[in-house]
A protein has these predicted regions:
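Bacterial Sec-dependent N-terminal signal peptides
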Residues: 1-28
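GH16 jelly-roll
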Residues: 21-271
Length: 271
């Protein structure tokens, strides 16, 4: 009986430890605490499909999503589901084929923000060929189609370059098609093993990437017009795992890889 009781306490302790690891949060920067309030969040403190009042989905494979990606996006529970306080996006290989399904959840038409502190706590997938991203796109194309109206990549990671994370913006003047994108990349140890906080602090003067509470990169508004700074209108948030593509698939897709997951602890927006 003593062994049974002891084992129960051990299991309870382990569970508490694991929950504590997941819920340990990076501190908010003081400049956010002092000037902003929480205006939108999803803590994923429920079970089942993500809250339909906050999230919608991209579906199918729209010409490889402009990047040669091979996954087909769905909103099926095997590709996106909330359980035990975490929203999990799962990319799945279909049998032994080269066909994949995944999910791309977004706040388009449901949540949009012009400026603020947009924060996502997530654990990234492993595996060559995976391409997870936390990013923002314009609710309306004020200055025209991509990249004229802007894109904010809060975080990207490609599986062939383990634990290296990237923060990037795209505009008419600065984008990867012409090799001028403004970006920083660096190793974040444990990005695929542990939860980390990925955020941008966005004002009319600067976009600042903040990882685990520390400044990672900054892009300044130099006042040279919308071609460089189209960030004067609302953007929505996107969370996804892509498979393959011009960047994610640069080193191929691991033939042994059957499944890849990105776990999201919470999403919070301050203004």
């Amino acid at each position: 009986m003593k062994k049974i009781v002891f084992s129960a306490f051990v299991l309870m302790g382990m569970a508490s430890f694991l929950i504590g690891c997941k819920k340990k949060e990076a501190p908010l920067p003081e400049y956010v605490k002092q000037t902003m309030n929480l205006v939108w969040s999803d803590e994923f403190d429920y079970e089942g499909k993500p809250d339909a009042s906050k999230w919608t989905y991209s579906m199918g494979n729209l010409n490889g999503w402009g990047n040669g990606e091979i996954q087909k996006y769905t909103d099926k529970p095997e590709n996106v589901n909330v359980h035990d306080g975490v929203c999990t996006i799962t990319a799945l290989r279909e049998g032994n084929s080269n066909r994949w399904t995944s999910a791309r959840m977004k706040t388009e038409h449901l949540g949009k923000w012009q400026g603020g502190y947009i924060e996502v706590r997530a654990k990234l997938p492993k595996g060559t060929g995976t391409w997870p991203a936390i990013w923002m796109m314009p609710e309306a194309n004020k200055y025209g189609q991509w990249p004229r109206s802007g894109e904010i990549d809060i975080m990207e990671h490609v599986g062939f370059d383990q634990d290296r994370v990237h923060g990037t913006i795209h505009t008419k003047a600065f984008n990867h098609k012409i090799g001028t994108q403004k970006t920083r990349s660096d190793i974040l140890k444990g990005a695929t093993k542990d939860f980390h906080n990925y955020a941008v602090y966005w004002t009319q003067d600067v976009i600042r990437w903040v990882y685990d509470g520390e400044t990672f990169y900054e892009f300044q508004n130099t006042g040279n017009g919308w071609e460089e700074w189209p960030f004067d209108h609302p953007f929505y948030l996107i969370l996804n795992i892509a498979i393959g593509g011009t960047w994610g698939g640069e080193k191929g897709i691991d033939k042994e890889l059957k499944k890849a997951t990105m776990d999201v602890d919470y999403v919070r927006v301050y203004q």
